[in-house]
């Protein structure tokens, strides 16, 4: 019987397959910035500058160039509603951890009043719950492990009470949150901390409405640059310098243009058709239906916020009716075609 060392020697001496034949995924602990950028760009369309900024921040942290007493990166994502801020963080979690929902997400709307601050850092000594050290954070998800960094998302950070924002300073600067009982702490030093904000959205929306009014006069304005200026000014006005200066990367996401809106619409349709394909239902959605969903699902001011609802009501509803009519029982394959007829989508059996 061969010794274990001989077995390992034989295994290590085997020919290494060429790079093009090596199988995905990337080994544990490895990092490929180009692969991450490609994966994020395939899901977050129209925001290449934001994707590049996030990948750059993660790359700097991965090589160990960051301060070990702080989080791996403090990244602030800012932009109008419905442009993919939260979805970008979910896609990062999908690539760095086990899935898009494998992150610690804190909705700062729930901390809008001062007396809710206890749920952020725990109850102080002498108050009910101080011994339990209850907080909103999942310690295992936040602290991660040597090969899997944590992902923490503070969603709509501007909605939190100033008391919570002051407590957040120690997370951004010291990389840890000391609980109010003074006996325990949670480390964020192996985590990427993301913050999202809608600051400046009102000004951007008003500028967008003004731009739509000016189209008739053919008045051309530089939309991305002007929008970034409005958002940056809103950030500097709202956040104190000591908070804003603790952010490593401020990423401003752009509004969607027509081409990006079409790409996002097709991605959302693909999610529906993929789910149906697993059940043996093949749905072909033609260009007229895509254009209808894009027109009804996108708002010039609020972006893609209502797109999923539109796809559910305008596409998924007639598809469900056709499936129940054509395949009431059984699991035999079914092919359907969806096309726009007027302001509705007609679904029928494919020839």
Curated annotation (Swiss-Prot):
ATP binds at residues 79-86. Residues 1-26 are annotated as: Disordered. GO terms for cellular component: cytoplasm. It comes from the Bacteria. GO terms for molecular function: ATP binding; ATP hydrolysis activity. GO terms for biological process: cellular response to heat. Keywords: ATP-binding, Chaperone, Nucleotide-binding. Belongs to the ClpA/ClpB family. This is ATP-dependent protease ATP-binding subunit-like protein. It comes from Rhodococcus erythropolis (Arthrobacter picolinophilus). The lineage of its organism: Bacteria, Bacillati, Actinomycetota, Actinomycetes, Mycobacteriales.
